[in-house]
UniProtKB/Swiss-Prot annotation:
<keyword id="KW-0472">Membrane</keyword>
<keyword id="KW-0812">Transmembrane</keyword>
<dbReference type="GO" id="GO:0016020">
    <property type="term" value="C:membrane"/>
</dbReference>
<protein>
    <recommendedName>
        <fullName>Uncharacterized protein US34A</fullName>
    </recommendedName>
</protein>
<dbReference type="Pfam" id="PF17087">
    <property type="entry name" value="HHV-5_US34A"/>
</dbReference>
<feature type="transmembrane region" description="Helical">
    <location>
        <begin position="15"/>
        <end position="37"/>
    </location>
</feature>
<dbReference type="InterPro" id="IPR031384">
    <property type="entry name" value="HHV-5_US34A"/>
</dbReference>
<keyword id="KW-1043">Host membrane</keyword>
<keyword id="KW-1133">Transmembrane helix</keyword>
<dbReference type="GO" id="GO:0033644">
    <property type="term" value="C:host cell membrane"/>
</dbReference>
<comment type="similarity">
    <text>Belongs to the HHV-5 US34A protein family.</text>
</comment>
């Protein structure tokens, strides 16, 4: 078994990935990145709106 693995390591040919497979991988990675950016932006907006709401409530209490 070990001999087989060593023999396999010696025959190190560059791995050829078909172009369309590479394209699909890039599309998936790009989609994941876009989704992550959207989530971060939504979370930031949510925090910002929450802060605004709290500030408005505080202002109303201090000026009756």
């Amino acid at each position: 078994m070990l001999k087989f693995l060593l023999k396999f390591r010696k025959r190190r040919r560059p791995v050829v990935v078909p172009r369309f497979v590479r394209f699909i991988v890039y599309v998936v990675l790009f989609t994941v990145a876009v989704q992550r950016v959207k989530q971060e932006r939504d979370a930031h907006l949510r925090r910002y709106e929450e802060r605004l709401r709290k500030n408005r409530a505080r202002r109303r209490q201090s000026f009756p």
